[in-house]
From Swiss-Prot:
Primary gene name: glgA
Isomerase keyword on record: no
Keyword Glycosyltransferase carried by entry: yes
Protein name: Glycogen synthase
Pathway: Glycan biosynthesis; glycogen biosynthesis
Length: 500
């Protein structure tokens, strides 16, 4: 069924390279390109387009059309502008159109979030995206909605547009990137959305006294996804469910976990221009030259000792309290640590103080620097991710690509992508600990250091295992295309419509 190229609209509140506050933008800038170019079931060249708001910082977007959108009891102007993102396929260049919803009142501001009228800004955005489609004369098979900002789209399709034949064949997929951010608003928002009080109930949009845009997506989308199989299971439990576990359990049979990918052209140690010495899986030993360069750059003694890298947002989620608990014990070992990140002042000050207390052992750059990040990925021997929770995780995917061995807690996407190295079989690609406990983290680090120091041949196998993993966007795209077909089939069966 559906043995033809698909028409896919990917909707996100932020998209690289136009607007970014977090990892969602990276996904929205990468996955559509992979979807447009991947060969799947012998098919390629799916018609993939992207929709996002046109924020103040986005320049040179060309005019396409404009129209009024009835929203919050009055007409608002929606201007559609367009940019493109480029994708490469078999040596040819392809473009993915990016439609930008422009409205001066809602989007001509400094920054993307967080404003007092978020419900109105993104409620309008979702309505305008749907109103745009008949103006373009384009009917996507699937609308892929991302996070709470896009939650009203499935809701609107099953309420305001339910009887409209233009929209009747469209399936929706809703992806939860981080359940912690839910878009919860006062119940008066229902009127703004054009919905009656009958939607203020637990079976619909009510969420502990609020109206939840995240819950709108979860309840009304045809199929749900999140960014790893383990996180899909975790969010159905009270520990990780952010009070949404009940509604997620009800839809467990339609909830898929698909690990995000990384751009294998951008993150390639063989060609990365930011590295002192390029290398590949057959010449991984050249990593050492990058280590020595990193040590010089970070004012650490240039010695062939294990270097542990840490690149992260400095927030509670990332397990930094575990590192703090064992740092003095770690520093008694013959190792070095290189830290890059910014975030909460408490953790920024903590790492500054560690650097002072352990000169020549710890280097910390508070802030973010893309070039330095790549040099840490390439120059470190091991990479720490002791996260409290991690829906998917990006750092471990990049570190694997660069042959830098991840030491991670078994949660979310970390559990799906990193497996404990087995000396007997030679399998595995990292070191893993289960309990959120500083001693468990220390034990995992100790296992990594023991192998590194005592068996370089085995360490070489481990590095090669890591570098040979495939976490490219092409792999993720194939999985998403199957989910899209599942959503289309569900719509076809439920509505009695044949979708060719």
């Amino acid at each position: 069924m559906f043995d033809r190229p698909l028409k896919i609209l990917f909707v996100s509140s932020e998209v690289v390279p136009f607007a970014k506050t977090g990892g969602l933008a990276d996904v929205a800038g990468s996955l559509p390109k992979a979807l447009a170019t991947v060969v799947d079931h012998g098919l390629s060249h799916h018609d993939v387009r992207v929709a996002m708001p046109r924020y103040k910082m986005i320049e040179d977007a060309r005019y396409v059309t404009d129209f009024p959108v009835w929203f919050a009891d009055k007409n608002h102007e929606a201007i559609i502008r367009q940019r493109e993102i480029e994708a490469q396929f078999q040596g040819a260049r392809h473009t993915v159109p990016v439609y930008m919803i422009d409205n001066y009142q809602y989007y001509y501001r400094d920054g993307i979030y967080v404003f007092d009228d978020e419900a109105e800004r993104f409620g309008f955005f979702c309505k305008a995206v749907l109103e745009m489609l008949p103006r373009l004369g384009w009917q996507p098979d699937v609308i892929h909605c991302n996070d709470w900002q896009c939650g009203p789209i499935p809701l609107f399709l099953k309420t305001h547009y339910r009887g409209d034949p233009f929209f009747s064949r469209m399936a929706t997929v809703f992806t939860i990137h981080n359940l912690q951010y839910q878009g919860n608003f006062p119940k008066e928002v229902l009127h703004m959305l054009g919905l009656g009080k009958e939607y203020f109930r637990p079976e619909a949009l009510e969420f502990y006294g609020s109206v939840s845009f995240m819950k709108a997506g979860i309840q009304y989308a045809d199929v749900l996804t999140t960014v790893s199989r383990t996180y899909a299971r975790e969010i159905q439990t009270p520990e990780y469910g952010q009070r949404m576990e009940g509604v997620l359990r009800q839809r467990a049979h339609e909830l898929y976990g698909i690990v995000n990918g990384i751009n294998y052209h951008e993150f390639d140690p063989k060609t990365d221009p930011r590295l002192h010495r390029n290398y590949d899986v057959d010449h991984w030993e050249h990593k050492k030259e990058n280590k020595f360069t990193l040590q010089r750059e970070m004012n650490l003694p240039v010695r062939d000792v294990p270097v542990l890298g840490l690149i992260t947002r400095l927030v509670d989620q990332k397990g930094l309290d575990l590192i703090a608990e064992i740092i003095d014990e770690l520093m008694r070992l013959d190792i070095q640590m290189v830290i890059l990140g910014k975030g909460d002042k408490y953790y920024e000050d903590m790492f500054r103080e560690m650097k002072v207390q352990h000169p020549g052992k710890i280097a910390a750059h508070i802030g973010f620097n893309v070039v330095l990040a790549q040099r840490i990925y390439a120059g470190s021997d091991m990479f720490l991710m002791p996260s409290r929770f991690e829906p998917c995780g990006l750092g471990q995917l990049i570190s694997l690509r660069y042959g830098t061995i991840p030491i991670v807690r078994e949660t979310g996407g970390l559990a799906d992508t990193v497996n404990e190295y087995d000396l007997a079989t030679g399998g595995g690609n990292g070191f893993v600990f289960k309990e959120y406990d500083a001693r468990a983290l220390y034990s995992a680090i100790a296992r990594a250091l023991k192998l590194y120091r005592e068996d370089q041949e085995a360490w070489g196998r481990l590095v090669r295992n890591a570098m040979e993993m495939d976490f490219s966007w092409a792999r993720s795209a194939v999985e998403y295309l199957q989910v899209y077909r599942d959503a289309m089939e569900k719509v076809s069966e439920e509505r009695g419509i044949r979708i060719a």
